[in-house]
From Swiss-Prot:
Role: Part of ribonuclease P, a protein complex that generates mature tRNA molecules by cleaving their 5'-ends.
Record's keyword terms, sorted: Cytoplasm, Endonuclease, Hydrolase, Nuclease, tRNA processing
Enzyme Commission code: 3.1.26.5
Enzyme class: hydrolase
Hydrolase as UniProt keyword: yes
GO biological process: tRNA 5'-leader removal
Subunit structure: Consists of a catalytic RNA component and at least 4-5 protein subunits.
One Gene Ontology CC term in the entry: cytoplasm
Organism encoding this protein: Methanococcus maripaludis (strain C5 / ATCC BAA-1333)
Similarity field: Belongs to the eukaryotic/archaeal RNase P protein component 3 family.
GO function terms (MF aspect): ribonuclease P activity
Highest rank taxon of the organism: Archaea
Record's protein name: Ribonuclease P protein component 3
Amino acid sequence: MLEGIFDINHIFDENGIKTLKRFGWDGSVAVQNHNEYSEEKINNAVEYGENCEFKVFSGLKLSTKNQNEMEKAVKKYRNKVDILLVEGGEIKINRRVLEMNDVDILSTPELNRMDNGLDHILARLGSTNRVAIELNFGNLLKSRNYDRSKILWAFQRNLKLAKKYDTPVVISSGANDIYGIKAPGDLRGFLNTITDPLYSKKIIETPSKIVDYRLYLKKDNVLTLGIEVVE
C-alpha cells in the first residue's frame, strides 16, 4: 500500500526534486507532454529521487482536440507511464475522457471555457470510471483578473459536483521549476478556502491512491480490478 502525499508537476531535475522533498512532499508525479515524451528523462528523475529517498513516478499529459487522436494516444502510452492525464476543455474530450478507465486524470476541464466544463452526468462518469478531476493551482496563479475569478468559480463548481457524486479530485502545483513548487500546506490551505477541511485532506491524499491503484494493476497476476490469478 503506497502512502504519503504526492505533488503533480513538471519537475525532472535533481535540484527540483530535492526542493519538493524539502517542502514536505513524500513523492511526485513528474508529467511530460506527450509530444515530448522521453523515457530517459523520466528514468533520470526517478534516479534523482532514489538518491534522496524520494518517490518519483512517471506521468504523461495528452493534449489534443481530436477524439480519435486522443484515444490512439491513450492506447500508445498507457503502459509506458504510471499516470495518464488528458487536457480537457473541449466538452467532447471531457466526456470521452471520463468514460475511459484507462485515463487517470481529466486535466483542466474548464480550460478556455465560459463554464466549468462538467455537469452532473460527467461527474457521475468520472466516479464510475475512477477518473479524477484536476485543479491546477499553477494555472490559477498565472491567470489574471477576470480569468482568475472564472477559474476559481470553476474549481468551486467542480468540487461541489465531485463531492456530491464521489468523483476523485486532485490538486496539482503544475510547477515547471523550483519557483512554482508549493508546500503541501499551501495547497491544502487554499483548498480550505473553497471547501471543507476534511474534503481538502481527501483531495491532497488522492494522487498517491491513484498511483497505488495503477501499480496494483501492473502486477503480473492482476487481470483487472478485483480479479487476480492465484497459484
